[in-house]
Amino acid sequence: MSEYCDTEQLAYNLSAFKPGDEIEITLKMHGTSQRTGYLPMLKGWKVKNKFFQGIVNKYASSSNLSTFARKCVDIVMRDATPIYDWSYVSGTRRTVLENYDGGYYGSNEFREQHSKTFEGKLWKGETVYYEVVGFTHTGAPIMAEGNNEKLGKDFVKQYGKTTVFSYGCDPEGESFKHEYSDCWDGMNVREFKPQSDIYVYRMTMTNEDGNVVEYSPDFMRYRCEQMGVKCVPVFAKATIDGEGGHIYAPDNELYGFVHETNNAGDTVKLVAEKYYDGPDPIGKTHIREGVVVRIVNRPKFTAFKHKNFDFKVLSNIAIEQAIETGAIGKMSDDEISEL
């Protein structure tokens, strides 16, 4: 299964944008990355000579052979044919999950339910990349909380004293809302909310030779609609004109957007900053992390993140708290990179 592609900072990669590029701006979500694929997995080898088949079955994958024995096995393996079987595989950014025990969260049980969402739905060779947001199965926030008081009174007035990146999820998996009617003084109504949720941002197709083809964002959304899963919200789609200073997007407010200089990267950054700040459109009770700008017309996944100032402040606070409590020493590279 192909690894997660690191999303670099937009501000340091403005030169990546060229006139004529098609771009798409989506919401950057603060969660933990996960991927699930329905992929050809090597199950064994087949050789014509039945006598050698037993040797291949026993020693082909062994790492404890002597140099002479390894050479003998390698000679037999020259005419061996690989046997593949299609299997569902899940992982984090760079780790394939053999099981859902342990890990930074104590258990990856909350990941398992989302992996199973795709069973029976992915086509052979497809891999889906998604963000898991909300809370773990124990009710703990997937991502660290933020102390809003360090951002000033106005920020606290709007978002409260603490930021919890809930994205509409609930620690218990349900919540109660108080409803009134003419016949009743009021009643508590149980409303189901997920403890955690997923949002897809990338899909690929991998063949048996290991060649990977990137799905376009539109086709990714088509497949997600078929599977009944959500995608990251889209803010804008646009094309950079031949001079680099105009953004053309007839279906939204960016039509004819002009930057003072004819530089594609600077123009894209200015457009991205129209969307990267403010309340999160899903969570609404907390700020958004920022945006991701993807160059759609590239054969490989090419995207850059742009985070807003308030989120960066909250992230630094979370890092400081993790250092003070010693929690950062238990974090994997995946968790640290998400802070």
Show which residues each predicted segment covers.
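Core nucleotide-handling region used for phosphoryl-transfer chemistry
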Residues: M1-L339
